[in-house]
Regions:
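Nucleotide-sugar-dependent glycosyltransferase catalytic core
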Residues: 18, 32-35, 43-65
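A short, conserved alpha-helix in the catalytic core of glycosyltransferases
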Residues: 1-44
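A general structural signal marking secondary-structure boundaries and capping sites
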Residues: 34, 73-77
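Alpha-helical structural context
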Residues: 10, 72-73
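Non-catalytic, C-terminal membrane-associated alpha-helical segments of glycosyltransferases
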Residues: 57-65, 76-126
Length: 126
């Protein structure tokens, strides 16, 4: 929950984030203005209706938001470190998924991570 006045002062959600990271960005911007965002662990949200994108699309949106958060909120000199960590994490997961796919005999087991690894420009945008 956020007071309307603060919501307006912050300009609402940043349109660069779609489905992932918008709350983190909003809280980081509020903190930069001296506010103290808090987590309310008992809060619940009920979506009335709705849809879900395929897993690969969700992964791409999530990782794009992570990279956008790093570029937008990390200190300029540290942002390349954060982006490198994301790249390394993606590489590790793609390798692990490929190995598990080979061991299990499921050749399509790593399709989503393979896509993320083969096309980092889609989310990393260096």
């Amino acid at each position: 929950m956020i007071p309307t006045a603060l919501w307006r002062k912050l300009g609402g959600f940043d349109s660069r984030y779609f489905m992932y990271g918008e709350e983190a960005d909003l809280c980081l911007r509020a903190a930069a203005m001296g506010y103290l965002p808090m987590i309310t662990p008992d809060a619940q949200i009920m979506h009335l209706g709705g849809a879900s994108a395929p897993k690969g699309v969700r992964m791409l949106q999530n990782w794009t938001s992570k990279a956008t958060l790093v570029r937008g909120h990390w200190p300029r000199l540290l942002a390349p470190v954060g982006l490198s960590e994301l790249w390394l994490s993606c590489a590790t997961r793609a390798l692990a998924a490929a190995m598990l796919g080979k061991l299990s005999g499921r050749s399509n087991a790593n399709n989503d991570w393979r896509m993320m690894w083969e096309k980092p420009s889609r989310w990393h945008k260096t």
